[in-house]
Design a protein with these regions (language model features):
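Glycine-rich phosphate/diphosphate-binding loops that line cofactor/substrate pockets in enzymes
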Residues: 141-151
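Periplasmic-binding protein-like
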Residues: 25, 87-94, 150-154, 186, ...
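Alpha-helical recognition/docking segments in bacterial nutrient-uptake
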Residues: 22-140, 204-205, 209
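Flexible loop/turn connectors
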Residues: 201-322
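Short helix-capping segments at alpha-helix termini
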Residues: 60-61, 174-182, 206-209, 231-236
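Structural signal for hydrophobic
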Residues: 23, 112, 170, 239-240, ...
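Hinge/beta->alpha junction and helix N-cap segments in small-molecule ligand-binding domains
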Residues: 32, 40-48, 67-75, 127-137, ...
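N-terminal helix-turn-helix DNA-binding module of bacterial transcription factors
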Residues: 1-22, 306, 312-322
Length: 322
């Protein structure tokens, strides 16, 4: 066939096998104001990494990947996804596109993999990272290596199982090690740098002593938090320690370089595709949910050197100047 330069016809292949040879990946739509600039401002770099990993693995396995976006838990999402069932062989849902009832309904009609979900659904297989161990290792490092006793946390979306799991595990660990995580120091953001900046500016406006360290639900949020602190004359890490989650490429070149939790977004997307194809190949067997490991990466924003040598956190809580 190579000598004849034969190229398989995907339509004919689908007719002969009863399959479309197309997988769908649906991710959360960003840019709430609906403008092009709003979409650019709210774009999530980590989502792009996950999509690229899924797309590469799908191609390796002989499938095309159809991308679609949806609003977070919007009532119309189920109807939109049902329309895709005649086009794709299976669906990967990134984060909270559907509630539990919607997932149960959809999964009766087409194989579904929840990517970065809570892992609690009995209706679909979940592929996620070990958020709990990640946040335990981070909180313990801040306390043990830097002497932090006053902690803050900057959340992502309240509807995101990842954000909820990270906040809960961080709180539980801080409580266990005897630290203080007051409610006023849990800030609401939306995964974006702009959201992190806005959350921190709001916190600084209260003119109350700051925690010694803020852990952020993702790297982009941490970048916005650091920007806001710098804008008010506070230095990271001399005045406040800041950490992220994801280890996107930007964090290595940011100043200060960002201490973060490394998770492989590309691997997350690839494994989700592998699990979905396994469900298609063996429709009578449901694969187990998958939890991928993470790694604590120590850099300058928490007071560590690149090699991990730690400096102590500031003992005196900073009061932002007005």
């Amino acid at each position: 066939m190579e000598q004849l330069e034969y190229v398989p016809n995907s339509i004919a292949r689908g007719l002969s096998s009863g399959k479309h040879w197309i997988l769908g990946l649906v991710f959360m739509r960003t840019g709430a104001d609906g403008s092009v600039l709003g979409v650019e401002e709210a774009s999530l770099l980590y989502t792009d990494i996950v999509i690229r990993g899924a797309e590469t693995r799908a191609a390796q396995r002989g499938y095309s990947l159809l991308l679609s976006s949806a609003d977070d838990l919007h009532p119309s999402n189920l109807a939109s996804l049902m329309n895709l069932t005649g086009t794709v062989d299976g669906l990967v849902l990134l984060d909270r596109i559907l509630g539990d009832d919607g997932v149960a309904y959809l999964s009766k009609r087409i194989p579904v993999v929840l990517l970065a979900g809570s892992g609690a659904s009995s209706s679909a297989v979940t592929v996620r990272v070990d958020n709990e161990q990640a946040m335990r290792s981070l909180a313990e490092h801040l306390a043990d290596a830097h002497g932090v006793t006053r902690f803050g946390f900057v959340k992502g979306s309240d509807e995101s199982p990842d954000s909820v799991a990270r906040a809960r595990a961080f709180r539980e660990t801080v409580t266990r090690i005897g630290g203080s995580l007051a409610d006023v120091d849990v800030l609401e953001a939306d995964w974006t740098s702009a959201g992190g900046e806005s959350a921190m500016l709001g916190r600084l406006a209260r003119s109350e002593p700051l925690p010694q360290a803020f852990a952020c639900a993702n790297d982009q949020t941490a970048v916005g938090v650091i920007y806001a602190l710098n804008a008010r004359g506070l230095n990271v890490p001399d005045d406040v320690l800041v950490t992220g989650f994801d280890d996107i490429t930007l964090t290595r070149y940011f100043n200060p370089s960002l201490t973060t939790i490394r998770q492989s977004g590309g691997m997350l997307g690839a494994v989700a595709v592998d699990v979905l194809i396994a469900m298609l190949d063996q429709s009578d067997v449901t694969p187990p949910s998958v939890v991928l490991p993470t790694e604590l990466v120590l850099r300058a924003s928490c007071g560590c050197s690149e090699g991990g040598e730690a400096a102590r956190a500031p003992l005196m809580a900073k009061v932002p100047s007005t």
